[in-house]
UniProtKB/Swiss-Prot annotation:
Disulfide bonds join C31-C82, C35-C58, C43-C63, C47-C65. This is Toxin Tf2. Contains 4 disulfide bonds. The keyword Signal applies. Keywords: Amidation, Disulfide bond, Ion channel impairing toxin, Neurotoxin, Secreted, Signal, Toxin, Voltage-gated sodium channel impairing toxin.
Amino acid sequence: MKRFLLFISILMMIGTIVVGKEGYAMDHEGCKFSCFIRPSGFCDGYCKTHLKASSGYCAWPACYCYGVPSNIKVWDYATNKCGK
C-alpha cells in the first residue's frame, strides 16, 4: 500500500512538472494582457508564441495561458505591479 501511494505521488509530481504552470499573460508594464478587442483565437497564438505555452484562451478581458514553462513570468495577484 505504501508503494502504491508513493507511485501515485510520483505520477502527480511528474504531471505537474511536464504540464507546467498556468496564468494570465502580462504586458511590459506587468498588467494582464488584454484580449478585449482581439479576434477569436488570438490568445492561443499569443500564449504559444510569446510565452511558449501549450495553449491559451481569452478569459475576458485577459489572455489566460496553460502549460507555461516555469521560467516564464505570468501575472500574479501577490506580486502585481500593474499601474504602480
